[in-house]
UniProtKB/Swiss-Prot annotation:
Pfam families in UniProt: LRR_1, LRR_8, LRRNT_2
Protein name: Receptor-like protein EIX2
Family named by the database record: Belongs to the RLP family.
GO CC terms of this entry: plasma membrane
Compartments, as annotated in UniProt: Cell membrane
Lineage: Eukaryota, Viridiplantae, Streptophyta, Embryophyta, Tracheophyta
Signal peptide location: 1-24
Main location class: membrane
Transmembrane domains' residue ranges: 964-984
Length: 1021
């Protein structure tokens, strides 16, 4: 639901300000304070016990004046150290967070700091050591924070001596919290956090309620569902000052486990019950908490009844989060039940639920600043009735089924972020968008919007604009961008737009993300890109550019991560890519007219696509840089030649390599076999020769396509023993000889096996029925795409390979072949013997081609079990005997070729088999029956049930038909008017009938909604 303010921060800030005021600390006065020698030595001794790998204590000891050391503050009058603050700041520069922690032990030398009142050692690593007992002797402490610092053991009982303590934070350690008796001595304590430890204190409620000044209590992740206070303890509780209560992640499943909190109805202002397991209706008693301002119920299992009507009493509520609670409720009703807080509510989180209906007039909530409604079932309109001007600053309606036009957006002049993506909005983006002067993010992606107004150009604060995947039409000119000086992220992907700007146009922005695929920007290369110096992503694919690559384009920004110029008609040479400062690069220049030698590949390249161009010459330059980060390389369909260099062992992360359709020669490099992460290898249609090197280490390999080369030798046994993940194996059009190894039958995931056009001999293995996928009748195969890893949000870069296969007697290339095709092709070899009967067990097979071999014997009798078979080619063999009757059961069969064998007898009668051309059966001298000549002496069977008098039979049929239709009309007339007449005459019947219909309609509607909501919830969980 976005970044939220923790109430604890207000308390801490307030406490720190009080400390600063009380001790009169200013940086200017501290600098004049003289350090006390004894305390300086104590601090240096404390430093010696720590490991400072990040130099955070580098100032300690550089000068005599310890009051100027980092993290130290002294009293301006006495010089005593009063503040020791060594907490680590957590930063998240990328996708991982980092903190420069201190490690080691806490030295008892701190006892020399007798006047210390502020100690913060949080977010460090004290190596599972116990909290030093001597800290309990620092009696002047008012602030103690040891959270997230890897302390273990029990909390020292000596903490009872810290009677001046106002803030105590021991959260997120490995502490064992057994006894809290010491708490009752801390009469000044206002803030207590014990969450995220091994909580075992059964007496927790009794002891905590003895702390008279406690205002904020954090017991998150304490497993409190196991320690429910007794009714007697609750009745005797006297904690009347408690204002803020954090109970997140305690495995509460019913309200009875936290009902004690309603005893503090006169003081509680903030409650956090998020991330529990509450699965029933929300407790009505929340409505009795008259001072409640902040309520977080997010991420629970279910709020069956939605927002209860008692919430109308919460007139001070300004924050409510019910996101991801499986709330099923009509949205207008929900807003009605919150009407009591319409003047106070500022933040409302309802995302990830099953809310339905339209967006009501939210402008009635005059203080509402943030509204989260994404990922629901909203299926109506956006504000059917126009209201007053709204104070909303953040609105997210994405991932719903909202429809209709957008309202007048001028009603939301304070909006900073507007997320409307993944809906069904239609029409034009309203002109009023130009009046949202504070708007920073505008996302209308994945809708059906058609028009983009020029008023967009007035949004001087707009930073991100995403209108991708709509049906936007027309021409974009400079006017659409005239004042977008803050814009850094522009996404107009996959619309019907043309970008028409002056040749010398200089945009007012400096973009970081440029996504304009399928926008018509041609035919010239857009010169305004020369003015952009900071982009990390540039995608102008499918932009209808037919131009030479300009010389200035080689000056790419050093921040560049992703470059996509694919599917244009750009020509010219690419000599070298800029060396990016980033950890990785993705370059896609595919489907253009680039020529020349292979450009020098950047060392940080992760995805590199040059396929479908006119590059030529050697690719030896690929070895000049160690491109160990590369995960996917596609150089296919160019004019590269020569031997492929043997340097692939340095690309240990490579998952996809496609070198197909080039003029490579020589041997397949041995180092390819060292790529343990390789999933797909395409080297078909080259001139590789010699033996195939071992790929036994490539145990993740799913596609091995090496067809159309001059490889020799036997099919290696390691294919069957080590490549157990194979889904496609294509060795077609090579010079392999010997028999098909039976070990190949261990490839249980295999969907396509193509060994055609080789010199294979021997018998077909009888174990082909071990191909598990090919035995399954139900379902299609898996997709042939690979989600190649890379570090750019929103996720993986999809690589979809293609495959050259013989399908229905035609050689074709298929993308995503595995979604549908299940094929065995052993044609054009020298195989002998019979067709194994086990082959009929492959009931999921769609194409079987055994043609052009020397197979003998009969056609397998059980072939009729292969119900999904669409193509069967057994031609040009030595097969004999009759065509099995079961062949007539193959209703999907559209290609059949049994020609040029020694088959005999009559072709089985069926609509399917007789529909094929004569050529499907030709070359079988003893075969007869349609579509060939009829067999000699054949007489069609007589229908013994036929009538000897056809005319009489026809008359009977005519009479029966007439009688049937007359009776049907009379029956309908009597029944219809009988029921309708009763309803007209009898009013009570009429009312009952229509009430029944209305109730039935409502029941069906609500039942379907509830079932859908529950199913949606289960899928999310």
């Amino acid at each position: 639901m976005g970044k939220r303010t923790n109430p604890r921060h207000f308390l801490v800030t307030w406490s720190l300000l009080l400390l600063e005021t009380a001790f009169g600390l200013t940086s200017r006065e501290v600098n004049k304070t003289l350090c006390i020698e004894k305390e300086r030595d104590a601090l240096l001794e404390f430093k010696r016990g720590l490991n400072d790998d990040f130099g955070r204590l580098s100032t300690w000891g550089d000068e005599e004046e310890c009051c100027n050391w980092k993290g130290i503050e002294c009293d301006k009058r006495t010089g005593h150290v009063i503040v020791l603050d060594l907490h680590s700041e957590v930063t998240c520069p990328g996708h991982a967070c980092f903190a420069p922690i201190l490690t080691g032990k806490v030295s008892p030398s701190l006892l020399e700091l007798e006047y210390l009142n502020f100690l913060d050692l949080s977010v460090n690593g004290f190596e599972n050591s116990e909290i030093p007992r001597f800290i309990g002797s620092l009696k002047r402490l008012e602030y103690l924070n040891l959270s997230s610092s890897d302390f273990s053991g029990e909390i020292p009982a000596q903490f009872q001596n810290l009677t001046s303590l106002r803030i105590l934070d021991l959260g997120n350690n490995n502490l064992i919290v057994k006894d809290l008796v010491w708490l009752s001595h801390l009469s000044s304590l206002e803030f207590l956090r014990l969450g995220g430890n091994d909580f075992q204190a059964r007496n927790w409620f009794r002891e905590i309620t003895k702390v008279p000044s406690l205002k904020e209590l954090d017991l998150s992740v304490c497993g409190l569902s196991k320690f429910v206070p007794s009714p007697a303890d609750v009745a005797n509780s006297s904690l009347i000052s408690l204002s803020v209560l954090h109970l997140c992640c305690n495995e509460f499943s019913t309200s009875s486990e936290y009902s004690w909190l309603f005893n503090f109805s006169t003081s509680l202002t903030s409650i956090d019950l998020s991330h529990n397991q509450l699965s029933r209706q929300i407790d009505d008693r929340f409505g009795s908490l008259m001072y409640l301002e902040h309520l977080n119920l997010a991420n629970n299992f279910g709020a069956e009844g939605g927002v209860p009507s008692s919430f109308g009493n919460l007139t001070r509520l300004h924050y409510l989060d019910m996101s991801n609670t499986q709330t099923y409720q009509w949205l207008p009703e929900l807003f009605l039940r919150l009407s009591g807080s319409r003047k106070s509510l500022e933040v409302l989180g309802l995302n990830d639920n099953s809310l339905f209906g339209s967006i009501v007039n939210v402008t009635r909530f005059s203080s509402l600043k943030k509204l989260y409604l994404q990922k629901n079932m909203l299926n109506g309109f956006f504000m059917e009735r126009v209201g007053q001007v709204s104070s909303l600053e953040y609105l997210d309606l994405s991932d719903n089924q909202m429809r209709g036009p957008l309202p007048d957006l001028a009603l939301f002049p304070s909006l900073r972020e507007l997320h409307l993506g993944s809906n069904q909005f239609q029409g034009r983006i309203p002109q009023g968008i130009g009046k949202l002067s504070q708007l920073r993010i505008f996302d209308v992606s994945s809708n059906r919007l058609e028009g983009l107004p020029e008023s967009m150009g007035q949004l001087s604060n707009l930073e991100r604009f995403d209108a991708s995947y709509n049906v936007l039409k027309g021409t974009i000119t400079e006017s659409h961008f005239s004042n977008l000086s803050s814009l850094v992220d522009l996404d107009l992907s996959f619309n019907l737009l043309s970008l028409n700007t002056r040749f010398d146009w200089v945009p007012p922005f400096q973009l970081q993300f440029i996504r304009l695929p399928s926008c018509n920007m041609g035919p010239s290369f857009p010169k305004w890109l020369q003015t952009q110096n900071n982009y990390t992503l540039l995608d102008i694919s499918l932009a209808n550019i037919s131009d030479m690559l300009p010389s200035w384009f080689s000056n790419l920004p050093p921040e560049l991560k992703i470059l996509n110029l694919s599917n244009n008609h750009i020509s010219g040479r690419v000599s070298e890519f800029i060396v990016s400062k980033q950890d990785y690069m993705i370059i896609d220049l595919s489907s253009n007219n680039f020529s020349g030698h292979l450009p020098l590949v950047p060392a940080n390249i992760q995805i590199f696509y040059l396929h479908k161009n006119h590059f030529s010459g050697s690719i030896s330059s690929i070895c000049r840089n160690t491109i160990g980060a590369a995960t996917s390389i596609d150089l296919s369909r160019n004019q590269f030649s020569g031997e492929v260099p043997d340097c692939w062992m340095n690309m240990s992360n490579l998952a996809v390599l496609n070198l197909a359709y080039n003029n490579f020669s020589g041997k397949v490099p041995q180092s390819l076999g060292s790529l343990t992460n390789l999933e797909a290898l395409y080297i078909r249609q080259n001139s590789f020769r010699g033996m195939l090197p071992s790929f036994s280490q490539c145990q993740l390999l799913q596609i091995l396509d090496i067809g159309g080369n001059k490889l020799t030798g036997r099919i290696p046994a390691w294919i069957g023993t080590d490549l157990l993940q194979l889904r496609i194996l294509s060795l077609r059009s090579n010079k392999f000889d010997g028999s098909i190894p039976s070990l190949i039958c261990q490839l249980q995931f295999l969907q396509i096996l193509d060994l055609s056009e080789n010199g294979l001999s021997g018998k077909i293995p009888q174990c082909l029925n071990n191909f598990t996928i090919l035995r399954q009748e139900n379902g299609s195969g898996e997709s042939m795409d690979f989600k190649v890893r890379y570090d750019y949000i929103p996720g993986s870069y999809l690589y979809i390979g293609d495959l050259l296969i013989q399908w229905k007697n035609q050689e074709s290339e298929y993308k995503n072949a595995l979604l549908y095709l299940k094929i065995i092709d052993l044609s054009s070899n020298k195989l002998v013997g019979g067709i194994p009967k086990e082959i009929a067990e492959m009931r999921g097979l769609r194409s079987l081609n055994l043609s052009r071999n020397d197979l003998n014997g009969t056609v397998v009798e059980g072939i009729g079990q292969m119900k999904l078979l669409e193509s069967l080619d057994l031609s040009r063999n030595q097969l004999s005997g009759m065509i099995p009757q079961g062949l007539s059961n193959l209703t999907f069969l559209s290609v059949l070729d049994l020609s040029n064998n020694h088959l005999s007898g009559r072709i089985p009668s069926s609509t399917q088999l007789q529909s094929f051309d004569r050529s499907s059966y030709s070359g079988n001298a003893q075969l007869c029956g349609p579509p060939l000549e009829e067999c000699p002496g054949y007489a069609p069977p007589i229908d013994r049930g036929s009538n000897t008098n056809p005319q009489e039979h026809d008359d009977d049929d005519e009479f029966s038909s007439l009688e049937f239709y007359v009776s049907m009309v009379l029956g309908f007339f009597v029944t219809f008017w009988g029921i309708l007449g009763c309803l007209i005459v009898n009013r009570s019947w009429r009312n009952a009938y229509f009430t029944f219909l209305t109730d039935m309609k409502s029941w069906l509607h609500m039942t379907s909604r509830v079932c859908f909501a529950r199913l949606k919830g289960k899928l999310r969980n």
